[in-house]
Amino acid sequence: MPLLNWSRHMVCLTAAGLITVPTVYATDTLTRDNGAVVGDNQNSQTAGAQGPVLLQDVQLLQKLQRFDRERIPERVVHARGTGVKGEFTASADISDLSKATVFKSGEKTPVFVRFSSVVHGNHSPETLRDPHGFATKFYTADGNWDLVGNNFPTFFIRDAIKFPDMVHAFKPDPRTNLDNDSRRFDFFSHVPEATRTLTLLYSNEGTPAGYRFMDGNGVHAYKLVNAKGEVHYVKFHWKSLQGIKNLDPKEVAQVQSKDYSHLTNDLVGAIKKGDFPKWDLYVQVLKPEELAKFDFDPLDATKIWPDVPEKKIGQMVLNKNVDNFFQETEQVAMAPANLVPGIEPSEDRLLQGRVFSYADTQMYRLGAIGLSLPVNQPKVAVNNGNQDGALNTGHTTSGVNYEPSRLEPRPADDKARYSELPLSGTTQQAKITREQNFKQAGDLFRSYSAKEKTDLVQRFGESLADTHTESKNIMLSVLYKEDRHYGTRVAEVAKGDLSKVKSLAASLKD
């Protein structure tokens, strides 16, 4: 018997109409995953009226199998999120800073934005106090660029080696699965650089009234590289055109009693009504030689850049809700590693770790082909030798899965090379030299109104109250070092030993 000509056989099958659903069934007829039409989806097959269910009931088995596998691993952080789509329009010529096409004046780039809470789980109330994620995927002409940030402009730590410990401290007690402030402050009493961001967290900025009403920040310093190879350090900031609105403690209680999803409901509802939220994108810019002029390290993620001018470079409008939450919001893979030529990571120690960690955790959640999912696919062609992986649905015809090759060249482009960084010295494991852990936190406290200070002091003090005595007094001494009124007032609420606090604060150096 001659071998079957598969290509010819497929054509014949197609022509005969044998691989499509027979026309005797309506196109909206219920089918199984193999395309076969279902005869009954309400009653299982049984052995008679009183007998057991039959193993041959493949519709029942498939429904249960698929149901048992609906969930993928929850994000370790940023689990609860809301995704929306929109467009970014560049408005300023910054070709002197970056060769990235996304910044070309007038360039319009589709975006996907995922807002989120950070610490709490996927089904937690959105009223819980938390930093809030503000991550934007730009589908640019140079490939996908992800600006993965938060509503706070600073972070709790400056070195990625502390990240797993910080998250563990924030998460519930592994013994009881209950929140435990004492564990958190046991950790943070060893991390004085955290207090500026802790101040933000316990202020009303930790409970925004809506995603539309909060700013976004890239948090880290990045490097922009122009066509000449010249490097500038920048920080990115989204400014809400809806204004900033937060909930005070009384409002939090009122909202939570009625709506566990107030952030999502507000955003989705506004877009559904045609009230499209907008944000302007700004950059702060420093030349490499300017990094040394500050009394703190500008590449420290726990710091803002005071007095460095901001330049508006574009505007984003969010105008479409997702079509399917799981396929888009849950499967979107945001990662600082997704960069394009003209945008590079700085030497920020936290960012360097996030470049690996975020891409790695997305691969763990979604598998090796996660970036091939529709929400993650770039708008430009992908051309490399990466192959296979579970659930690979691509159609690859090339026999060349390596590089270099004469059979099928995939040349690199020198214009996409990374910038060069002059280095000297030896390898080390040491703290940064310009920590300045206290000044910016004190400045932040003093910037708040009287009511904002009162709300902050009350929330921070209540959280500290049941903390182990030594950790409590250390935390209070840091607050006292930042601003004596701040430390004194929180100590009153937390019932700390003020004389001990003052003594500890006297030994601290900024």
Curated annotation (Swiss-Prot):
Span list, region Disordered: 386-412
GO CC aspect terms: cytoplasm; periplasmic space
The UniProt record lists the keyword Metal-binding: yes
Positions bound to heme: 358
Spans traversing the lipid bilayer: none
GO annotation (BP), single: response to hydrogen peroxide
Biased composition (Polar residues): 386-400
SUPFAM superfamilies: Heme-dependent catalase-like
Keyword presence, Nuclease: no
Family: Belongs to the catalase family.
Annotated protein name in UniProt: Catalase
